[in-house]
């Protein structure tokens, strides 16, 4: 095959995209089992070096902070990180709305009906949670502590009543020792919103906490240098910008 053969095949691949994906999934079982009881979903986008919108190539929030029109892609992977299905949608569309059409295809065309949906907070809207509270599906998604009601936020940040995952022993995470460095701690409680009865799970990892502490220390050091050198930016576009530590 030569390059022009690949180009000629693109239109066929595009028109048969859904069928090809479902058949690849079904035939993959001939090579081994798929960990399809846990599905991860995320979105990204791709920019085009053009100066005007064209079709689904629309101006939107580029992951690479480019000022060009973009196409967005939603991707499901299985529990082992192997791609399952994807969809493309306009660059100016809210990515929250991309889940339902693709998940519907998985349910109808793939025959994959029993799974746990996992995503970050950006794709964990109330509607997406409701969608995955139906049938044989469930969900585990990230929840911003800052956006919790005051009572739940206070409970989440309270350092008492955690349990050690390895033995369920109740601990106060302010009294951890060096031996607990590799341990994981959690606590949970009922969490009810307008549409759903859920459970809110808070986890704490001493190892990850130390990692985040080191990152903050480095960012504070950079912020101090910015102040000293007079290079402090007035606008803070990135939540990880060191300048956020300076009032």
Question: Regions from the language model: what does each represent?
Answer:
Residues 1-247:
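Anion-binding and metal-coordination hotspots
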